[in-house]
Each structure stands twice: as C-alpha cells, then as structure tokens.
Amino acid sequence: MAKVMRAIIVGGGIGGAATALSLARQGIKVMLLEKAHEIGEIGAGIQLGPNAFSALDSLGVGEVARQRAVFTDHITMMDAVNGEEVVHIETGQAFRDHFGGPYAVIHRVDIHATVWEAALTHPAVEYRTSTQVVDIRQTADDVTVFDDKGNSWTADILIGCDGGKSVVRQSLLGDSPRVTGHVVYRAVVDAADMPDDLRINAPVLWAGPHCHLVHYPLRGGKQYNLVVTFHSRQQEEWGVRDGSKEEVLSYFKGIHPRPRQMLDKPTSWRRWSTADREPVEKWGNDRITLVGDAAHPVAQYMAQGACMALEDAVTLGKALAQCDGDAARAFALYESVRIPRTARIVWSTREMGRVYHAAGVERQVRNLLWKGKTQSEFYRGIEWLYGWKEDNCLEAR
C-alpha cells in the first residue's frame, strides 16, 4: 500500500485554507497550524477576477463563492480632481464570454469562509489554533515544526502560508520587506449611509495625486466597501491598527466633492501600512515552499493578492499530483511557473500605483491615453492576468 503524503501548512488565511483544500483533494493528509485563537479573516472587501473563479471552481467551491459574491456591471476609474470618467470596462456577458468567468466583489470574511468550510469538512484536514511556529528543522526524510509551547509536528512537506511576516519565509530566505510608504484605510458602511450618486454596482476607483479612493457593494448591495490609499509622510513599518478620520481628510483636501463626501461616512476605519518584497528566484527547497503573501506580498493596486493565493494553491496541488508526490520535483515545477507570474504581478502593481497616483502633466497624459481605449483594447491588455485557467496552470504564463 502506497504511503500517504503528509503536509504541514502554517497559516489559516485564504491562502492556507485554499492550500489545505487543494492538497487534501489530491489525497494528501494535512495538518494546518494557525497562530490566532480562531481561524478567520480581518479586513473588508476584495475583488475576484475570472482567474480567481477558475481556481475556486478547481477547488470545488466556485458555486458557493458565486452565491456570496456581488457580480459587477463594470470597472470604472474616475479622475478624483475633476470628477471625469477615465476608464470604463464592461464586466457583463461580453467580459464573461471573453475570459470564461465573471468579475465580482465579496467580503473577505465570506470568501475565506467559503474555502475554509470546505477544507474543515474534508476528512484529510486537521488543524490547530493558538499555535505560533518558532522553529523549523528539516532532514533528508521529513520536516518538523516546533511551536512556542514546545509542541512539534512532523510531515513530508511544509507549506508556508503565514502572510507577509512569514516565519517560514524568514527561516528560508531571511530577506526584509520593501516598505512602500503607502497607507491604506478600509471601512464598510451600510448602503443607506452611502451617497445616492455613489451607489454603483461596480468597483469605482477615484485616482488623485498621490492618493486614490475605491468603493463597491458587498453582500447583495446591503453594504459598501470603502478603501482609501495615500502616500504617507513617513516610511512606516508593516502593520495594522485603528485609523482616524482626521488623518484621512488631511490627505484628500484637493479632490472633487463627489468622492470626498464618502470620507465622512464611516464611523471607524482600519489602517494598514503596506509593504511588498522584491521577487526572488527561489522560494523554498526540496521539502518546503511558500504560498500567497508569504511568497509574493503585493500592494492592492491590481486587486490580485487573494487571487494569486488561490492560483498558488491550485497550482501546488496540481504539481504534486503530476509529480506523483515527488515533493522536490513538484515544488520545482510549482515555483517555475508561479515565480515569474507573481513577479510580473508585483512589478505591474507597483507601476499601476504610480499611474493611479499621477499628478500634473503625468496625470493629464494618463487620462488622454486611457480615455481613448476601446473595450477590446482593454480586454487584450488584461488577457495575461485574467486568462489564467486551472487546466493550464502548470504552463508558464
């Protein structure tokens, strides 16, 4: 009887839950370790492109995700200085036909629950909470992790899904994050509190000099997600804390009254100081690799953080299946296709942030270039991003 492969997954966020489910569906026995007291998500809304839905379908949870998501009519970018529309991409049937899937928005808690509920009920998945991994030891035959209470777990492979401040990554690479100087505020408001002229069934981005705002509906349009980003006056370390309305308003003094009216609506904000990492040529080794933000933390400008984690999870499961459980070959294959794609996302996201936050003549040129684009031109420009499918995930894209 063939030996059943055992995997330890560190981290129970979207990437960890998806990886647990992906590996379990390939017959791998999973132990997931989460440092928090319970497995869940913080944050507000996220956007899901067709690539994310292809991954969710591969994991067997696509229909549940669709039931919890809000399907958008379009994606729009407005100039936050003069209030004019710059970009309008239809995301209806023509978009679905072109990319093979929808564009949607969803509460982060809901998409995490969608994946975690399926993983939790899979007989091959076990988990432990309140488990802070502090040490990792690897031999030729297995890998063992130790927590801060002296407990240990041993398996054939280890997957680090423990986010931007990954302990697993630190043990492998020891590199430092790249502090961006950008701060993100997030809040959720009831639809009744949203200005009438901004109750739009779409992600709408208002691009301003050194700042931008985003809003879109959640949970059947009963709530709206608000996100504001600005260049901080200080280079801040990665972190999350409560924010202040006064700080938000101080960075958005020069924008058009229409988007500015949103800033008074939230009763509370959460504040993220952001960072990413320089792409590297290798994430792990023969028995250890990384998924999601542990591998390739990325800013929010292309709304691809969760989508990339879902792609990673599916690709890793497919690689292990194709390589018949040979971890070294599977991890090499996985990294060979995921590192170039996610590096492109990281670098493209940085550039997109610069373009969104353009000022002066650069802002004027941006608007002229983007206003003239047709729908087919927009679709061609994002084909590389949204054209990912689970059936071609082991091919370089």
Swiss-Prot record:
It comes from Klebsiella oxytoca. Its EC number is 1.14.13.24. Belongs to the 3-hydroxybenzoate 6-hydroxylase family. Pfam families: FAD_binding_3. Its cofactor is FAD. Optimum temperature is 25-30 degrees Celsius. It catalyses: 3-hydroxybenzoate + NADH + O2 + H(+) = 2,5-dihydroxybenzoate + NAD(+) + H2O. Inhibited by copper, mercury and iron ions. Induction: By 3-hydroxybenzoate and 2,5-dihydroxybenzoate. GO terms for molecular function: 3-hydroxybenzoate 6-monooxygenase activity; FAD binding. This is 3-hydroxybenzoate 6-hydroxylase. SUPFAM superfamilies: FAD-linked reductases, C-terminal domain (SSF54373), FAD/NAD(P)-binding domain (SSF51905). Monomer. Catalyzes the NAD- or NADP-dependent conversion of 3-hydroxybenzoate to gentisate. NAD and NADP function equally well. Keywords: Aromatic hydrocarbons catabolism, FAD, Flavoprotein, Monooxygenase, NAD, NADP, Oxidoreductase. Optimum pH is 8. GO terms for biological process: catabolic process. InterPro entries: FAD-bd (IPR002938), FAD-dep_Monooxygenase_BioMet (IPR050493), FAD/NAD-bd_sf (IPR036188).
